[in-house]
Structure formats: structure tokens, C-alpha cells
């Protein structure tokens, strides 16, 4: 084998090893051997501004629906939107406008997250007679921006019931029985695709919580509506009663969180049910990345501030596209910081450290192609929504956050 080719291959393998070995170093590490045609550098940028803030909790796309109270959280009500076509036959709701179709009744059901009933309060169901097809937004609706008064008075009440149809497993459902007048109310001639949303709430205040499956829980029984009907074949012949099932496609719990704690506001905090997010600004103002350089990693590093063992807790991050307010902890009715989803990244906490690799956006910033307003941190929907994570901020003398960039330069 050509000696020069063999030597270059050895150099490449050595560089790979150096990248791994020096990934935890903060100082620049030039590879100065005259025989090596590339240089490996590591540079650290300080986080100079950091702040947590709160927005109304947005609980869409979580696995569960919550009612009642838990640990200071008030679960006011749940909003549920149904699919426009039935699960198996693909029957649209307009099917029931046919004069040969007689709707006998409807049953709206939610699957309880437990297989036993200890306390069985009464729930009530409302709908939206004046709403179109977009009563709520699963990703944006919350206790501040949603107007509950647009819902009807309650149209049905229900309680938990055990279903023993499956001999291998007992399931518990919350069932609401509805008569055909509800379908008639839905079928306003001015609404071609009539409203398919419901509001479910406890009839009375409860001190405990009641948890149900949402439409996002994989392999579970999400909310559904069954429409029982008969069909006339002719004036004198009518088929037996059958039904169509319509599954929920959007749902969320509207919750009011407890007051913010001192820890929530003094550390960098993230948590879905508390509505907590954080922003940080990395000082990269005077940095210009050599056009020939290739960044292998650009880790934004945070240290976990709780004495707890975590597994599979994921934090997501993006650059923000407007200036942040880093003066003090604030609460907003709406998130004021828009994200650039093109640079979305996520990672899990490992050994009490969170290392978010922003290699792509760091390259753009280093090439002076992107304005650096900072980065947002928020919790992933896959986490426990009631778990708030705390990280040390810039006032910590030993565990302050930092961005560490490793790059190779020919």
C-alpha cells in the first residue's frame, strides 16, 4: 500500500479519536504536528443572559385527559373534537341528513385510566351549537384564550361504568347518553360540516383527580362517539338498528396551574403543566468561523439542579427570532418568543447534564448568516407534564451554562 495513503488514513483515525477525547475540554486544542494537515479546535462561549418565563399551559397531544384537582392544579374542563368520518366505514356526518336515516340515540365515551372505581362523581357534557368547525386549537387553546361561554348548557350527565365485555380485562368508561335531538340541532342548514366538538367537565368541584385516555395515547381507547341509527330501505322496510363510531382527533385538558415557586423563577425551568420555558443568550458576537471549518458539535450545556435520578426526560430547543427580555421572570398570556423550527433539536438529560447540539445554527451564526437572539428551552410532550425540570443559571459559580463548539480546520 502507498505509504503516504496509509499515513493519511492513520491521521483520519487519530482525528476521530481526538474529537471524542477532547469533546469535554473548554480551551482551544490545536493539533500542531507539521505532518498533520488539519487542526482540531474547541472554543467555549459563555451564556451571558438567561431567564425563565411562564405562559398558560398548553396540554394538547399529551397521553391523558385530566379532571378535578391535583397538587394545586385545577383541571377545569376538557375539549374534544371528533373525526368527520366514522372509524371503519368512513361514513360522514352528512349521512344522517338523509330522510331515510333515523337516528335513535348517541353515546359519547371516555376511557378511564384505572380499571376500578373508587369514587364516582357526576360529569356533564356540553356542545357548541353556534361554533363552526374550529371551536378550539389543540396546540394553542388554554384557560386564558378560550371562551367557555360559547358552549351550550349541559346536554347530558354521566358517571363511570365498568365494561366486562372483555373477559380478560375490565375497562371503565365515562358514558354520556344523548337523544337524537342533538343530531337535529347539529344539522343546521347553514353549516355544511356541522360542529364536532364537545366540552366535558365535572358537575361539582372535586378534591381529587380523574384521568382518562386521550386520542394521543398509543394503543389505548381515546374518546369516541357512537351514533345508533336505522335505515329505511323502502316505505315499509326498515333495517335493524346499527351504529357508526367516530373517534376523537383532537383533545386537551384546560388547566390552571398553581402559583410559581421561588425555584421555578430563580433557576432555568421547563415544565408543560406549569407553562414554564426558558431562554438563554450565548455571547457569539465577535466570533467568525473560518469558511473552511467544519463544526462537529456545538453543545449548549446545562447542569441539572435537583437531587433526583432522571431517565428519558427530553428537552427541546430552537433559536428564537426576536429579542428576549432577560431582566426578570415574567408571565405572559401568549408566548412572546417565536421559534425557528428549521433548527429544532432535542436531547435527553444524561448523568445530570443536558447537552443540546446546535451544530447547524452555530455554523450559520459563525458564518455571519444568522442573527443570534438566543435559544428557547421547553419540555417535550413525551415527558410527564407535571414534572418541572430545574437547571443552574448564569449566577451559579460552578454549574453555569456554556456553549462548547468543536470544529476541524484544514
Give the residues covered by each predicted segment.
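Secreted, disulfide-rich extracellular signaling modules
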Residues: 2-8, 21-410
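Bacterial N-terminal signal peptides
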Residues: 11-21
Amino acid at each position: 500500500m502507498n505509504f503516504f495513503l496509509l499515513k493519511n488514513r492513520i491521521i483520519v483515525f487519530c482525528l476521530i479519536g481526538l474529537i471524542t477525547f477532547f469533546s469535554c475540554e473548554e480551551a482551544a486544542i490545536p493539533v500542531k504536528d507539521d505532518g498533520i494537515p488539519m487542526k482540531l479546535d474547541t472554543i467555549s462561549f459563555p451564556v451571558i443572559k438567561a431567564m425563565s418565563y411562564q405562559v398558560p399551559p398548553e396540554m394538547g397531544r399529551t397521553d391523558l385527559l385530566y379532571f378535578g384537582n391535583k397538587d394545586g392544579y385545577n383541571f377545569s374542563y376538557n375539549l374534544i373534537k371528533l373525526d368527520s368520518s366514522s372509524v371503519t366505514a368512513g361514513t360522514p356526518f352528512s349521512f344522517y341528513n338523509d330522510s331515510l336515516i333515523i337516528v335513535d340515540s348517541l353515546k359519547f365515551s371516555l376511557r378511564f385510566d384505572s380499571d376500578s372505581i373508587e369514587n364516582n362523581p357526576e360529569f356533564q357534557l356540553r356542545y357548541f351549537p353556534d361554533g363552526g368547525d374550529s371551536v378550539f386549537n389543540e396546540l394553542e387553546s388554554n384557560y386564558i384564550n378560550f371562551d367557555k361561554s360559547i358552549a351550550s348548557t349541559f346536554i347530558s350527565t354521566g358517571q363511570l361504568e365498568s365494561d366486562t365485555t372483555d373477559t380478560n380485562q375490565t375497562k371503565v368508561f365515562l358514558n354520556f347518553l344523548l337523544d337524537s335531538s342533538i343530531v337535529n340541532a347539529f344539522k343546521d342548514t347553514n353549516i355544511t360540516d356541522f360542529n364536532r366538538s364537545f366540552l366535558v367537565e365535572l358537575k361539582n368541584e372535586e378534591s381529587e383527580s380523574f384521568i382518562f385516555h386521550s386520542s394521543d395515547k398509543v394503543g389505548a381507547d381515546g374518546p369516541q362517539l357512537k351514533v345508533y341509527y336505522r335505515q329505511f330501505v323502502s316505505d315499509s322496510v326498515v333495517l335493524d338498528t346499527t351504529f357508526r363510531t367516530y373517534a376523537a382527533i383532537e383533545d386537551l385538558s384546560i388547566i390552571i396551574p398553581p402559583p410559581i415557586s421561588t425555584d421555578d423563577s430563580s433557576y432555568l425551568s421547563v415544565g408543560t403543566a406549569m407553562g414554564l420555558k426558558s431562554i438563554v443568550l450565548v455571547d457569539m458576537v465577535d466570533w467568525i468561523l473560518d469558511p473552511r471549518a467544519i463544526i462537529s458539535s456545538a453543545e449548549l450545556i446545562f447542569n441539572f439542579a435537583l437531587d433526583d435520578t432522571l431517565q428519558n426526560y427530553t428537552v427541546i430547543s430552537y433559536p428564537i427570532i426576536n429579542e428576549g427580555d432577560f431582566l426578570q421572570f415574567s408571565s405572559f398570556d401568549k408566548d412572546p418568543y417565536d421559534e425557528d423550527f428549521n433548527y429544532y433539536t432535542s436531547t435527553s438529560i444524561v448523568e445530570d447534564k443536558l447537552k443540546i447540539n446546535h451544530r447547524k445554527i452555530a455554523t450559520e451564526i459563525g458564518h455571519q448568516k444568522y442573527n443570534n437572539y438566543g435559544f428557547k428551552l421547553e419540555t417535550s410532550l413525551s415527558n410527564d407534564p407535571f414534572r418541572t425540570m430545574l437547571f443552574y443559571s448564569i449566577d451559579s459559580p460552578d454549574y453555569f451554562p456554556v456553549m462548547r463548539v468543536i470544529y476541524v480546520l484544514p
